[in-house]
């Protein structure tokens, strides 16, 4: 079982299946799987090695700023979010598994049940970057320790290299309610999120770490071309002196240097492009220079964010230019 969360305008494509699979989608958020009050709102077949695509066209109809009525006859007031159960079977329902899909109406909504607050724009990691991820405990329990693992390896202590896909899991050793148990630990699986670490990551020169709209920390490797510049301003006074030899007439008494960067992303899919607002509107952003591992606070100066898609970009993948300035200036006297 995995849990996926989407906004109503995001493209919902679930991972490819390993065998020909029949599936059904049931509603809704107030009932548990198998409840008699649930209704099948969609069903279909997906072939081996193919993914279940464009579910947003079906599920987005069930979220609305006004009251809606489910096919089961149950009315939800101001349905800002909805939960669906998607069942899979490869043996004509002799056995089955299910996942949970949560879809929300807009960016102002905050899920009280959400335990993972990070939603990275891409799943690409650089071996030299810091890994940041935010989880919250299930109230009123208190988590005193969180173990972050990728395919069983401790990512916080083990340097990972090579072009490999990793399943990302968060283990909570304390007893947390309503979470599945695994060997005495409680585990949160972030959907089917997989992080890719290319063996030759020469394309990323900078990493941005930022606070997203859910209050969680995310990161973005900048794998496009980048340019660092410096804006220089000077204050001068005129010195009464004989203008000859090495004497200065106009003397610089304060020079201000403001560093700025023009950073370009790699090509993003529709899902990644829709999350760019998290970075461009963030007021807590840090820039890491991978050439020397320095990290400084920066301010994003972009004044707008386009919600780019493959379709509205003329069947091209989206890319963004991020303009940032150093939060602190340098002075020379």
Predicted features and spans:
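Extracellular/virion structural assembly segments
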Residues: 2-3, 11-13, 134-137, 180-181, ...
């Amino acid at each position: 079982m995995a849990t996926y969360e989407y906004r109503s305008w995001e493209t919902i494509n679930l991972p490819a299946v390993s065998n020909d699979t029949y599936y059904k989608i049931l509603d809704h958020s107030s009932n548990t799987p198998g409840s008699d009050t649930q209704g099948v709102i969609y069903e279909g077949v997906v072939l081996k090695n193919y993914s279940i695509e464009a579910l947003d066209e079906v599920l987005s109809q069930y979220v609305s700023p006004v009251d809606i009525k489910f096919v089961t006859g149950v009315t939800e007031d101001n349905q800002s979010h909805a939960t669906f159960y998607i069942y899979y079977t490869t043996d004509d329902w002799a056995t089955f598994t299910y996942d949970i899909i949560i879809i929300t109406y807009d960016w102002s909504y905050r899920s009280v049940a959400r335990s993972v607050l990070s939603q990275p724009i891409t799943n690409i990691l650089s071996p030299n970057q810091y890994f940041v991820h935010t989880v919250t405990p299930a109230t009123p329990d208190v988590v005193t320790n969180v173990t972050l693992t990728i395919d069983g390896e401790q990512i916080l202590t083990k340097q990972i290299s090579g072009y490999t896909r990793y399943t990302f899991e968060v283990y909570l050793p304390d007893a947390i309610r309503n979470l599945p148990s695994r060997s005495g630990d409680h585990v949160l699986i972030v959907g089917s999120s997989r992080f890719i670490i290319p063996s030759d990551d020469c394309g990323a020169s900078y990493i941005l770490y930022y606070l997203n709209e859910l209050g969680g920390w995310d990161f973005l490797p900048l794998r496009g071309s980048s340019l660092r510049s410096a804006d220089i301003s000077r204050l001068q006074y005129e010195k009464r002196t004989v203008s000859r030899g090495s004497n200065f007439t106009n003397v610089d008494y304060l020079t201000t240097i403001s560093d700025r960067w023009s950073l370009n992303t790699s090509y993003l899919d529709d899902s990644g492009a829709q999350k760019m607002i998290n970075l461009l509107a963030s007021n807590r952003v840090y820039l890491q220079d991978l050439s020397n591992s320095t990290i400084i606070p920066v301010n994003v100066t972009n004044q707008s964010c386009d919600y780019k898609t493959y379709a509205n970009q003329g069947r091209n993948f989206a890319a963004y230019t991020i303009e940032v300035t150093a939060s602190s200036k340098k002075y020379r006297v």
